[in-house]
Amino acid sequence: MNEKLKEMREAWKNLYGSLFKWIVLSGVIGSFIGLIASGFSYAIVWVTSFRQANPMIILGLPLGGLLIVWMYKITGQEKNSGTNLVLTVVRSDEEEVPGWVTPLILISTAITHLFGGSSGREGAALQFGASVGNVCAKYLHLNESDKKIIILASMSAAFSALFGTPMAAVVFPMEVISVGVMYYAALVPCVFSAFAAQGISLLLKVRTVTPPYLVESVPNFYSVDSIKAIILAIACALVGALFCIVLHNGEHYLKKWFPNPYVRVVAGAAGVIILYFALRTDAYLGLGTGVIQASFKETAGPQMFLLKMLFTALTLCAGFKGGEIVPSLFIGATLGSFMSTILAAPTDICAACGMVGVFCAVTNSPITSLLIAAELFGFNGMPFYCIVVAVSYLLSGYYSLYKEQKIVYSKTENKYVDKHTK
């Protein structure tokens, strides 16, 4: 009996000790990352405003690209695979995210947005979060298991501070690494780091990438509108898979045609500049949050999501930095907005469904997608978001933005597959 009591005391001591440790560590690291993310957010807002006030600065995009390639080369990070490296680090004991990544990705993303590259900034968030977490783990002499947990918590913090969706930020790093397996050991650290980081960003009045969107027109779920949601979900799955194919093939062929990274980045920049002057609009440059917001009120043109794909592929595949998730939200919102005319459905609910549907298709993260929907659009349309996310997740197959993402369990049957995404 005494032996059992002793074991129980030891078990409770370990549990409460672990809770205290992770609350303190994740709270401090989340607050620190919140400060970095807030500064980064203000930098992106400033460079975007400067670009919009001085549109001809886009002619400097090739020079910006050359600077980015040079910075990665002199720091020995020219082979850095970005977010794919982060996914590998969490699964493997052999890789790590070096400290150099934080200044490199933040500066490179700011340069990309200053000169008009079409990209997001969540790639930067996940990478600098993982980099900070890795450095902290080293200085704190954490073991390999705790290091991976603190990296996930740091990713949650960065995502939360920039996107303003802390609940989605908690789940995304745990869900995106290996589809079908959740890293629940990181749940407590991810929760406290995400909310600490968001608290700092709110305190500093950071403008998030995705402000809440008002969805007023929610149809009756038990009607023909639920069938329309399935049709929209199919479109989201197809477009999401297409976006992944365009990005991966774009990277492959640009490397094949332009083996020299300096020539490659100039070629990509030239493509963006030519398209910009041909179309005479800056709607596809930078984050494109203005277009996302407009998609909820006005019907988007059928070409908009396709052009955003093209601009983003030329930018990121050439060697510029930022991320693919905000472009995927742009693509989803404009696709949904356009589909609203075909489906004879309200524009705002279709744009919202399009955003979460394409996000789910390209990340294979259905739980995160639903949490994003709840935090951005509220719960009124949740039955529609559930349908769109579920169908889009299934029909997008094994495509993903991230080549190092793994599908652990099949999407169509209860079967262990453990395969890399396409």
Where are these regions (language model features)?
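Alpha-helical transmembrane segments and immediately membrane-proximal extracytoplasmic
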Residues: 1-422
